Amino acid sequence: MVKLRLKRCGRKQRAVYRIVAIDVRSRREGRDLRKVGFYDPITNQTYLNLPAILDFLKKGAQPTRTVHDISKKAGIFTELNLNKTKLN
């Protein structure tokens, strides 16, 4: 199973995170399938690759709680629901 979760980068006391699609059995800093975003909690900057995230969500990837909250603020789930209603 694939999850969308945070991967810690940066230096000591100055963490930044990459949002990655990664296998559930991998470690936090393990090999990821694809980098789909970036999150800096100190400056509150976020970059999300929306097409890649939507593609993984459509294939069944599960976001962690933190990635879900970040994505919700960016409006990804409203876009995903709009795409579903267009298909029906």
Swiss-Prot record:
One GO cellular component term: small ribosomal subunit
Keyword Chloroplast applies: yes
Localization in the cell: Plastid, Chloroplast
A GO BP entry: mitochondrial translation
Keyword Transcription among UniProt keywords: no
Gene3D superfamilies listed in its UniProt record: 3.30.1320.10
InterPro entries hit by this protein: Ribosomal_bS16, Ribosomal_bS16_CS, Ribosomal_bS16_dom_sf
SUPFAM superfamilies linked: Ribosomal protein S16 (SSF54565)
GO molecular function terms attached to this record: structural constituent of ribosome
Alphabetical keyword list: Chloroplast, Plastid, Ribonucleoprotein, Ribosomal protein
Pfam families: Ribosomal_S16
Database matches in NCBIfam families: S16
Family note: Belongs to the bacterial ribosomal protein bS16 family.
The protein, known as: Small ribosomal subunit protein bS16c
Protein encoded by which gene: rps16
